[in-house]
Amino acid sequence: MSRMAEQQLYIHGGYTSATSGRTFETINPANGNVLATVQAAGREDVDRAVKSAQQGQKIWAAMTAMERSRILRRAVDILRERNDELAKLETLDTGKAYSETSTVDIVTGADVLEYYAGLIPALEGSQIPLRETSFVYTRREPLGVVAGIGAWNYPIQIALWKSAPALAAGNAMIFKPSEVTPLTALKLAEIYSEAGLPDGVFNVLPGVGAETGQYLTEHPGIAKVSFTGGVASGKKVMANSAASSLKEVTMELGGKSPLIVFDDADLDLAADIAMMANFFSSGQVCTNGTRVFVPAKCKAAFEQKILARVERIRAGDVFDPQTNFGPLVSFPHRDNVLRYIAKGKEEGARVLCGGDVLKGDGFDNGAWVAPTVFTDCSDDMTIVREEIFGPVMSLLTYESEDEVIRRANDTDYGLAAGIVTADLNRAHRVIHQLEAGICWINTWGESPAEMPVGGYKHSGIGRENGVMTLQSYTQVKSIQVEMAKFQSIF
């Protein structure tokens, strides 16, 4: 693909040049080619976007629930019509296989938008009787202008997960995509405008997180920030949001999730789940089950089943329908993953497979890392303690149920957890003791629109998806009505 035209900001229903004068490049990680130069939003651009959003939000909130619902449903239709085009762009920008982006990224994002479009008319207040002459009623009102700050692994899906409930509740959103993968969020802005969203209700500001993102978190005109990213960055976003104007926040942060295989489990099923929990999207999924706990007596058999499945991984041309494994999202990220792999070897973990870059025709110019499985791991190893966010699985053994629950919970993270067992009593007994916000039994990874997702501990605050997220983009106003004559003590 030839280099794209320089990408601008999207403010008030159209493209506009950044006043900062700064730019950055977005790279195709499969081959290292520059896809486009992208303009970076500065402080003045954030001010412009907030002013635009304030204007648009008033128009948007004044529409009826059914009017807003119809506009968002039109956006859903356009997303599905343009699925292949958007998936190709997402593949170029992220490196993910087209077999994945064409069936997951836009599809699941559109599902979430459709879900919230249907919920808009159900946003209701309540009535509370006090006495014969008085009652209270409540209204759910939009927050106003909110900000979404996205991660690089699911660019358009994250933009939809954040904008769908925000817009459904009557807010305007300013979205800052990751500077690593900024392209499809701009296309989403076009789609919202085409669907009839008032100008300013969805503005997109590409830029560097430390600058553009910080300006958004500090801006007094923004009522809430929804952030997806790492723990350290999340803490900064939360601190800035609180210090500036006590903004509400939703934080979807990192994870180091446990997958527990019990001795009664079907090991073929367990191996299939472990593969999806570690190598889907080349391991760049925040909920990945990278700590795989296996009974000591099952270790050898389980290792062989994992090795057999690694052989089925198909890396290569990301647009080949048979390819199911792409490069990492960027060269700096690849280098970071390789540092973790080196650390694992240094600390005594045994490499069962992988452990290096992929080499050969088609790989040498890209950010490719081989699917890697470490065994003979211990809980104190760096690769077991820290989030790697790449195709690196760590196998650990255990002896008892109590032991594995304790070890699974021995982490600052609490995003996800899963178990594989044939015993449903055990399944529920154990899952209720795991300190994680998203849990799976005999499956892994699905996050449908109806399911609230978010983390415990350092893995986040608040939830995305589900009814409660729509409510989190509103504020409750209580109104007391008195029909009897008011009595003053003065």
Curated annotation (Swiss-Prot):
It catalyses: betaine aldehyde + NAD(+) + H2O = glycine betaine + NADH + 2 H(+). NAD(+) binds at G150, A151, W152, K176, P177, S178, E179, G230, V231, A232, S233, G254, C286, E387. InterPro entries: Ald_DH/histidinol_DH (IPR016161), Ald_DH_C (IPR016163), Ald_DH_CS_CYS (IPR016160), Ald_DH_CS_GLU (IPR029510), Ald_DH_N (IPR016162), Aldehyde_DH_dom (IPR015590), BADH (IPR011264). GO terms for molecular function: betaine-aldehyde dehydrogenase (NAD+) activity; metal ion binding. One of its GO terms (biological process) is glycine betaine biosynthetic process from choline. Pathway: Amine and polyamine biosynthesis; betaine biosynthesis via choline pathway; betaine from betaine aldehyde: step 1/1. Keywords: Metal-binding, NAD, NADP, Oxidation, Oxidoreductase, Potassium. The active site is at K162 (charge relay system), E252 (proton acceptor), C286 (nucleophile), E464 (charge relay system). It comes from the Bacteria. Involved in the biosynthesis of the osmoprotectant glycine betaine. Catalyzes the irreversible oxidation of betaine aldehyde to the corresponding acid. This is Betaine aldehyde dehydrogenase.
